[in-house]
Amino acid sequence: MRYESLIFDIDGTLWDSRQLVAEGYNIQLAKEGLSHLAVNAELFRPLFGKVMTEIADVIFSSVPAPERYELMKRCMDEENRYMHNNECNIGYPGVRETLKKLSEKHRLFIVSNSQQGYPELCMEKLGISPYIQGHLCFGDTGTTKGQTIRTLMEKYNITDCAYIGDTQGDYEATLEAGVPFLWAAYGFGTPAGYDARIDQFSDLLNL
């Protein structure tokens, strides 16, 4: 692969956390007597990749703002605790082995639209921390994913890279950032365009 650096999305690219996220949210909702707002894994399929406020506007639309965003924050905190303690393997096949091999020739990074702590949680659970040289998320920057990609590039002096993601939002972020898009076709979305496609994570070794 010709790119000096590779930047990865998380959900739908490195792992599928939908079931654990839904379970974590529902634990918090039950604690607050809000089980009527319970969510399920499939609800998150079209939402992963969006920023937290956009997700809250959909799943907690019946809760007035700004209370819905405060509720979202509490659910995400519980989600992180729940996922940290859950030993279920939610990584896509071959992620750790592929990243280890890629790290021998490329610098590897993560950019996500997630809350703070989520990239670290992903790296810890998948055992990929030794291979990731840096990460940024919406919780860090408060900006669009495209701008967050640019911020990461500036921070780490990245001039030649590609972004690996799965959704239309990821594709649009690469257009904003001005970088190639490698589509993880096994993920959650169908983007309008891409520069290369992978049908399984290990396909990255063959590009």
What are these regions (language model features)?
Residues 1-4, 116, 120-207:
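Asp-based, Mg2+/Mn2+-dependent phosphohydrolase catalytic module
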Residues 2-93:
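N-terminal helical cap/lid subdomain that shapes the substrate entry/recognition surface
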Residues 81-110, 146:
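Short, acidic loop-to-helix structural element flanking the phosphoryl-transfer center
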